[in-house]
Amino acid sequence: MQHLVLIGFMGSGKSSLAQELGLALKLEVLDTDMIISERVGLSVREIFEELGEDNFRMFEKNLIDELKTLKTPHVISTGGGIVMHDNLKGLGTTFYLKIDFETLIKRLNQKEREKRPLLNNLTQAKELFEKRQALYEKNASFIIDARGGLNNSLKQVLQFIA
């Protein structure tokens, strides 16, 4: 079995689904944003504000290469922009959690939105969301309809890997 890699826009449910998949499949769960945050000693928002997005993307790219060297399969929850890296291919079986922008914003309360620097301006966030759709689809081994909630997404992933 390869790594199971969850991609999609911020707030699509990647972190929650990763935890459920890890439990169901008895696999360790890794979260790329959390790993970067712990290593740098700053939250993702603080990294963006203090070090800039370019540095954050460099940390992401390096982490992808590092994760490729792991010998055992993991469930990997990724940041929303990870699809901008060419080295994502080959990391594992990739599941795109597809959701519409309106549902995504409804799911995220104000506190959650404040943690996500790219959601500061909803007009710009929607433009980014639309721009990334093609990248998510291009990088996906499978597309998961994430509008139906966590249990529905879990069932879809488990069916694809059965």
UniProtKB/Swiss-Prot annotation:
Pathway: Metabolic intermediate biosynthesis; chorismate biosynthesis; chorismate from D-erythrose 4-phosphate and phosphoenolpyruvate: step 5/7. InterPro entries: P-loop_NTPase, Shikimate/glucono_kinase, Shikimate_kinase/TSH1, Shikimate_kinase_CS. It comes from the Bacteria. It holds the Pfam family SKI. Its cofactor is Mg(2+). Substrate binds at D33, R57, G80, R132. ATP binds at G11, S12, G13, K14, S15, S16, R116. It is found in: Cytoplasm. Gene3D superfamilies: P-loop containing nucleotide triphosphate hydrolases. Binds 1 Mg(2+) ion per subunit. GO terms for cellular component: cytosol. One of its GO terms (molecular function) is ATP binding. Its EC number is 2.7.1.71. GO terms for biological process: amino acid biosynthetic process; aromatic amino acid family biosynthetic process; chorismate biosynthetic process. Keywords: Amino-acid biosynthesis, Aromatic amino acid biosynthesis, ATP-binding, Cytoplasm, Kinase, Magnesium, Metal-binding, Nucleotide-binding, Transferase. Mg(2+) binds at S15. It catalyses: shikimate + ATP = 3-phosphoshikimate + ADP + H(+). Catalyzes the specific phosphorylation of the 3-hydroxyl group of shikimic acid using ATP as a cosubstrate. Belongs to the shikimate kinase family. Monomer. This is Shikimate kinase.
